[in-house]
């Protein structure tokens, strides 16, 4: 029992260890479950499509900033997400569709396989102002090391389409991106052939917002020591090799259609760059970087490059780059011409890198040299050779030109030595010069060992130094040898030699400019000229001149002294002969000027005289300035200026000028006397100045101005006061009087920052205007009352009331005089509160009245229009005084218009009518018996209706206009008539039916429509007998075209004077009843023509048929059997196809036809003589001229035929002359001609003694028999005729017409 009980006593303690192990084991199990269950759960969920979808939906619910509209598929076969949105502070993202496909089977081979990653229409908007501040990056970047990847990555299909990114005011779009990438330890990073197309970047540049000016911060001095320290270490430092994390393989990256645009707030393009093509190919193998190809084609130019770089060892380098730069333009102007640039880099980066740069274009240059990037301060040795270069920096200046320039630069970044040689010229102020420079320098200083310049027909040499370490310091010496300064001062072509020395400083501590030595001498206009002296300027003493002397021939100027708060400066001049010093300057000047006291209020002593001064258009016979002015406690002094015979140009001639000023502040007087043309003034001013109150008071008296319109005087002394504190003047009431004008200021007025001036023109005789324009056109008087006022806190005010009675205007036009009588005229103008009201009432010749009431509100900004304008029965008969006897114009103008809108967009309402138009003018082809034209205005548009009546026809006019947009106004006018009769004296009578439309806008004037001519009778007198044709080689010297060919080929105006392009498309239909009688041609016409004009080219198209025609040629009367004129472009170059035959009635054999064919271009047609049936040319010509053959040439008849033809050919040109002779003797229609055939031919003279009685006399050419014929018309178709010859015959004739 004991043994059994004993263990029971210890039972509570013995189980402690087993219980602890149990709880530990339990805790481990629970912790593992907490970690592994979610991981395994997520992994399990990602293994199935449903799990993947559930996880995405869970994230969508848990995150407010993330949402997905639709989820399809799974990662293994392709997970598709639609309308994915993500939003955070400053960033909004939207993806229309995303597809992601993974191959989980690749994980077993330690590879991540991304089969597809496609984004469609991703949109990203970023507002940088809302982005949270980024945390500072305190990490230090170490050297790059090779990376060993635990797993490979293979992305087969990476696609992005229609990407849109907006970052503040910059918009970026990407049309298409397609690529594939693989990354592993064996091959590194391989980017498969990649396409990046249709990139567009649009940057909007906002106008700068004016910010409040900030207090200026003192400029911190440049820390040159820090700059030197930063430039001292080698550029490559201790870089022994460049290690890439992995190899890189880029078979090809290509891009097409890339574009960059900078626009303003209105969307207007400020800058545009287009890159049409980009190709890049690169590779790294065995620590060698190879650029196989880089090619860029863009609007800026083309670039191509290739090369290689070893990334270890001495880093050998071999790189070539070639580019062609297109002309660079800004605001349509070329700022950089086209250029070619070739760059070659070779050598090694660790030792010496050689470079070669060649340019061609704006600069034809070659730069060669080497730099040592791995050495401290980067030692360099460069040579630049420029064959030629030219560039225009300022459009108004000549371009800068450099030629044969060589620059050698050796040393390093901190210490350098430069040698320069070359030629330079241009920029208007740089003469052709040869420059040679030898200098040493540092970052902050330069020492010029020698600067030689061969220019201006001489030489100059400079030595010295300049330093800008602490402000600016310089010390320069110059030696000049025979330098001609005519290039800079053409009117002073002096040749100078000598020495100049300048030194000084400028900085925060002050400034000083010192010229310790100035010793120049030379020749000017064959006289010696010299300058010797020294001068100093600084912030304490404005100017110190120990001694300065300038001599020119016998002329000299001497200056010495000090200008500061205690000035003591004297200037002496004695120039008895200034000829040759400056341009055409001549004359004599002598005197002295002394300045003492404080420079701001100096004391002056003046004693200068001159005589016979002449400079260009200025002439002065004699002048003097004498006086003393003391500006101590109380300003006082005396000054006298006199001048005699002062002439300038051909208009200003002052015979005498005398200005005398004397007194002090308390009591002073100014007297001005002058005589001359066109204006001379005489006046006296007495005044008093109170320095304490800063007020001046005085009177202007004895005022008289001699002007082209006569003497102008004041009616009294004028009291004037001025308050300097208030900037205000007060002028007492007074009047200005002239024989034609009297201007009065009826009450005292103020003028200053604000003022109020009432005025009154009591009388304005319009003869004053006649004197000014040197014509006698106006008569009458005007009266004007008004007031003008201006203020500091509101707009100015102005009122004027103009009244005129019995006004007249006359103007000679040729031999006539146009007179216009205006019995009464009133004009009232009022500007109040920035609004203008203009009222007018004009009675015109007691035959009409013009009444206006026009408002223009808000003059400063909107300028709103309002008011009315009425024209009451203005009679057009006013113009009859310009017409000849028997001519007249009648009608009346009636209008009532109202205005609205503003000046930029005016609105007009009302009517404008011209009624009862009647004209009878010799210069017009029609007389108007009644006509009306009515314009109707409705806001920003109008319509036109018109009707023009003649005795037997009428013309209709319609039209419309629109100016809703004043810059793009439109108008249209149509003219239409039916058988409108036109009578052109001594030329033509015709009936035509036009339907023509004219359209116009600011850019184009368009004429179109049709013109039908059903009936016309055109008769043009032939040229006079003595007229000779224009020679083929004649040129017109005073015309715009110089030869016949240019006249034919000339272009008509393509644009109007206002810039509108002229276009026309007009069809002309010539009817069947149109006849022409001109220059021996009698025929009927018909056809269709089209007139077209575009861009200055006037074209005529179509054809005209000649029917029933007769033509006098070769001394014969020819019948037109066939006539066709065709136009296919130039109106002066039609194609002719005309066939004219001899009248069969005059042929010996009526079965034979002889004639002329004219075929070809009018300028050079082919003319042939033909016969039917066909005969030799001599026979055909004989038939054409004589009507018979040449076969019986020995017969008398044949000889008579030839003689008759020759006589006929001669007298065919004399009809006009014979007719003129007949008129002298009272015989109408006297003409000379031939009749008969062969040896029966006669010469006949016929004419009308009265309208009924005709006489004809004929003489045989070969038989000499005379014949007299008298014919009397009893009735229109019945004649009595008597023929007296070898026999006496009486006939009674009746005429039939078929």
From Swiss-Prot:
Pfam family, one: TamB
Keywords: Cell inner membrane, Cell membrane, Membrane, Signal-anchor, Transmembrane, Transmembrane helix
Domain of life the protein comes from: Bacteria
Topology in the lipid bilayer: Single-pass membrane protein
Family per similarity comment: Belongs to the TamB family.
Subunit and partners: Interacts with TamA to form the translocation and assembly module (TAM).
Biological function: Component of the translocation and assembly module (TAM), which facilitates the insertion and assembly of specific beta-barrel proteins into the outer membrane.
Descriptive protein name: Translocation and assembly module subunit TamB
Subcellular localization(s) per the UniProt record: Cell inner membrane
Periplasmic face residues: 49-1298
Lineage: Bacteria, Pseudomonadati, Pseudomonadota, Gammaproteobacteria, Pasteurellales
Any single Gene Ontology cellular-component annotation: TAM protein secretion complex
Side of membrane Cytoplasmic, spans: 1-27
GO biological process: protein secretion
